[in-house]
Amino acid sequence: MARLRIGVLYDYWWGEDEERAEGTRPKRKPPDEDVQAVYEALKESGHSPVFLRLDGTRESLVELAHSETDLIFNLVESFGGDDTQDSDVAGFLEMLHRRFTGTGSQGLHLAQDKALAKKIFAFHGIHTPYFATVFRGRTEHAQDIQFPVIVKPAAEDGSIGIHFGAVCTSIKELMERIDYIHAEFNSPALIEEYIEGRELYVGVLGNEKPEALPAVELDLSKLPQGMPKIAGTEVKWEEGTEAYEKTKAFLPADLDEDLQKKLSETAVQAFQALKLCDYGRIDFRLAADGALHVLEVNPNPYLHADAEFAMAAKKAGRSYPELVGEIVDLALARYPNGGS
């Protein structure tokens, strides 16, 4: 394999710092653990990685445009603290005709717009929970949803805006939650049928012939009594809390062959329906009656060596450096003379 200069692109914004003087650039800080892990894996694979940082300023975009790399490993999830702009960053790279890993601007936009993604799933015959989209003063695509429901921002990811209070069992709770979403996120609210069941994640690798990785389950059974079994903000981000500490991912051993096949086929179908590239993760709910529901598609899953995606890849026989190297190879193959 040719030794490549690969820019590991990540986002960082001034709001993560203490208050800064007007007109000054954000302070430097070490990259997050997943960014550092990808950097080290690329180095181990014989490449020459360099860090590229987007901090929400025009200057950082100019620096990115002038950076000299053979490929950009795109780990950006936001721009200037706005996580709805990851597709704009991909679009910027596309306009610069830069080669980069992962899904392009179109696929990122489709996955970000949860209501649009669900309509695409329905068109392709992929089962997803019933839903309605509520704008200020207007409801769109209202299906016959019954309580309990879960209410979330229509265009956020990473469980942002999804707390335990997002699960509503009455009209009063529902209206309060819709008002919260409108006020806090200036976003339409997505009301979705709440599916009680197991939380399963299926990673997908590939482009022309995508491969579904073994399913990983997030164990929500040990959440404190009275809390809904959802992977909300408390579970994903609030380190040190009981909810965070008691939810662990593992490789389930009790999924029968038919279910594994259905998970794999549906994951690949959803991956392709939203035009994902190279890698991605499909989030499912498995109901008690065996029904499988696609909750959402994550085109840029957390790539830390200990996270769910790498866990599934390891089960499929790939070391972490091999996984990172395969993502590089998949990206290069999408471009003319990709390996040169």
What does each model-found stretch correspond to?
Residues I171-E265, A288-H293:
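Phosphate-binding site of ATP-dependent enzymes
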